[in-house]
């Protein structure tokens, strides 16, 4: 028997919010191209998602589920991927900061983006306690996952017991391939969503 109260816990309210923001940002990037037309604002996107939820969410799951499976296959489990992801986001922040200040010698492009993220020099890493706080994964589990990642030569530990990315290693090549593959799938997802909103019979 289904408990109706449980439905409230299944509502993807935060995901709809984040997805709407993401689609809006991509819409702004494409605005100005003759073939794209007007950009779409966040509230417009949210209304569309909620009105045609089953259509949009089916398309989202076709993106999200294979995405998670690819990372699980690479990292053995999703918790390890999340731990690694916190370190990667820290590097991504430093790369963005340096790029904004025009301190990057080689232009950051679609094809060299992941390599640039791993190679960027960071002043500080991120420690196990911070990763546990951010991810809500128990600290003992985080430490165990970090040890595996260090052993796999994907990350390294500095003298302050903080973790940073490494730019070499067989596993990094696999992660880089996943990154490129993911970008193609994201592009296909966005193409379908924009097509739904601009060219289909689905109207708000």
Give names to the regions the model predicted.
Residues 136-151:
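Short amphipathic alpha-helical interaction segments
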Residues 61-72, 95-100:
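Short, Lys/Arg-enriched N-terminal segment that forms or immediately precedes the first helix
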Residues 1-26, 110-111, 127, 154, ...:
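Short, cationic-aromatic polyanion-contact patches
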Residues 82-124:
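Short helix->loop/beta-hairpin flanking segments within DNA-binding domains
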Residues 1, 123-133, 149:
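A short alpha-helical element within helix-turn-helix/winged-helix DNA-binding domains
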Residues 71-79:
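Structural motif
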Residues 8-59, 63-68, 177-204:
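Amphipathic alpha-helical dimerization/coiled-coil segments
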């Amino acid at each position: 028997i289904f408990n109706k109260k449980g439905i409230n816990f299944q509502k993807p309210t935060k995901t709809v919010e984040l997805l709407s923001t993401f689609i809006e940002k991509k819409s702004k990037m494409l605005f100005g191209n003759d073939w794209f037309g007007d950009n779409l604002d966040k509230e417009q996107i949210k209304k569309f998602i909620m009105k045609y939820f089953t259509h949009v969410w089916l398309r989202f799951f076709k993106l999200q589920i294979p995405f998670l499976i690819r990372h699980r296959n690479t990292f053995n489990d999703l918790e390890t991927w999340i731990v690694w992801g916190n370190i990667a986001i820290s590097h991504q922040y430093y790369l963005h900061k340096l790029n904004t200040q025009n301190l990057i010698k080689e232009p950051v492009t679609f094809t060299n983006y992941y390599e640039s993220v791993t190679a960027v020099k960071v002043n500080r890493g991120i420690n196990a306690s911070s990763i546990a706080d951010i991810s809500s994964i128990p600290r003992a589990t985080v430490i165990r996952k970090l040890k595996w990642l260090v052993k796999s030569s994907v990350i390294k530990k500095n003298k302050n017991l903080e973790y940073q990315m490494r730019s070499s290693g067989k596993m990094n090549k696999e992660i880089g391939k996943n990154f490129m593959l993911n970008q193609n799938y994201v592009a296909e997802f966005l193409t379908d969503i924009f097509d739904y909103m601009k060219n289909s019979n689905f109207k708000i």
